[in-house]
């Protein structure tokens, strides 16, 4: 009889993007959902410089797929986008078991109180109005929400 303990074998996956950011030392994953290419480029560059692993998509339909496949720690979500609005994306993510607990920051041009109330009712963690914040404010809110334990 062989008394050796078998060596555990790693679980193989065809999709490296499914690895969780909970791995020790791994950068936090941010899904940036923004249809404005210029603004998205600025945010993408700055967030990467801050040490985040960032994936950007330009519409709500792609955001839903990326939330499931990329498994972000936090989503920065525009509201007014082609195909599926940010409000609809938020609603779907909150009602999907795999994404229900995602941290979601709405970053939008919509400044009406009714829009903020709608985002709150749908479960947004934060609601930032583009004209009232600078990128350092957004990074501060991202860090805050990532530091919160569920």
Where are these regions (language model features)?
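The feature encodes the CheY-like receiver
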Residues: 82, 100, 112
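Helix N-cap/capping motif at the beta->alpha junctions
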Residues: 56-65, 86
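Active-site residues of response regulator receiver
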Residues: 78, 108
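Conserved acidic carboxylate
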Residues: 34
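Active-site beta3 strand of CheY-like receiver
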Residues: 70-76
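Charged docking surfaces used in two-component/phosphorelay signaling
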Residues: 41-49
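Non-catalytic signal-transmission and effector/linker regions of two-component phosphorelay proteins
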Residues: 1-29, 136-150
């Amino acid at each position: 009889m062989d008394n050796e303990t078998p060596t555990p074998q790693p679980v193989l996956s065809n999709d490296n993007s499914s690895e969780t950011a909970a791995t020790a030392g791994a950068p936090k994953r941010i899904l940036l959902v923004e249809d404005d290419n210029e603004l998205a480029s600025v945010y993408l560059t700055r967030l990467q410089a801050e040490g985040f692993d960032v994936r950007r998509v330009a519409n709500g339909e792609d955001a839903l797929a990326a939330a499931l496949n990329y498994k972000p720690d936090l989503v920065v979500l525009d509201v007014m986008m082609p195909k599926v609005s940010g409000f609809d994306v938020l609603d779907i993510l909150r009602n999907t078991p795999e994404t229900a607990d995602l941290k979601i920051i709405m970053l939008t041009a919509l400044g009406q109180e009714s829009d903020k109330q709608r985002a709150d009712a749908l479960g947004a963690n934060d609601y930032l109005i583009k004209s009232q914040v600078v990128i350092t404010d957004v990074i501060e809110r991202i860090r805050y929400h990532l530091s919160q334990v569920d």
